């Protein structure tokens, strides 16, 4: 199953949440718009994918987002391809983006109570405002394009493979870890609850 959600929200941050968001010192008001894709395939041979980008306006404005891949069974070729596509999205804009955003992804998508990463990583960025809105927006769009290229290639390579009941059980366990992360650690989930 694949879910794609486009949301635009506005309002006022609560007193207890305001100090966690940049640019709210003078005003608690915000506007945010984003697109999010979460793909959990029926086949345990096909990884789960997550992608989101957003633009947020408070007293300041910025882009954020990223993409990551969570396979049930690690396939190094898939991991290499996914990271190659993320690097292709980043490189034209700044040579430092990919290593910096990959590191942030590795740190962010981590289950500290289990001492394990959620998946094989990707990129994660926030508070992006270089002063050139058009270039920043072009980067965000390229992250989406390259994510789609990676997903399409990987899904097409594995979608027809057969699997066993034991492999399906492994996939369900991995999905449980995914849910744990979202409920315990995900800033986007918290933002949605708080707004």
Model-derived segments and their meaning:
Residues 1-65:
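Internal mixed beta-strand/loop scaffold within catalytic domains of large alpha/beta enzymes
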Residues 179-195:
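A translation/RNA-centric and nucleic-acid-associated enzymatic feature enriched
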Residues 87-136:
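Hydrophobic, aromatic-enriched interface-forming segments
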Residues 15-17, 46-48, 75-78, 190-193:
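Short helix/loop capping segments that flank catalytic or ligand/cofactor-binding pockets
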Residues 2, 31-34, 61-70, 116-134, ...:
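Glycine-rich, often proline-containing surface loops adjacent to acidic residues and nearby aromatics
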Residues 59-103:
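Compact, glycine/acidic-enriched structural inserts
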Residues 41-43, 57-59, 69-76, 127-139, ...:
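A generic structural motif
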Residues 1-22, 128, 133-184:
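Gly/Pro-rich turn-and-neighbor structural signature
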């Amino acid at each position: 199953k694949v879910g794609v959600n486009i949301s635009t929200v506005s309002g006022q941050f609560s007193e207890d949440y305001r100090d966690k968001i940049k640019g709210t010192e003078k005003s608690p008001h915000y506007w945010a718009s984003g697109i999010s894709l979460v793909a959990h395939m029926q086949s345990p041979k096909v990884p789960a994918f997550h992608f989101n980008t957003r633009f947020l306006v408070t007293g300041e404005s910025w882009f954020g987002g990223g993409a990551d891949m969570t396979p049930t069974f690690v396939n190094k070729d898939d991991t290499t391809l996914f990271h190659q596509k993320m690097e292709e999205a980043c490189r034209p804009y700044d040579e430092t983006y990919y290593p910096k955003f990959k590191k942030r992804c590795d740190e962010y998508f981590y289950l500290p109570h289990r001492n394990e990463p959620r998946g094989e990583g990707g990129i994660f960025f926030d508070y992006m405002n270089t002063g050139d809105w058009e270039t920043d927006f072009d980067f965000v769009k390229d992250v989406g394009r390259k994510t789609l290229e990676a997903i399409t290639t990987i899904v097409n390579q594995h979608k027809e493979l057969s699997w066993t009941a034991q492999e399906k059980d492994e996939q369900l366990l991995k999905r449980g870890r995914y849910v744990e992360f979202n409920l315990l650690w995900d800033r986007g989930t918290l933002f949605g609850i708080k707004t």
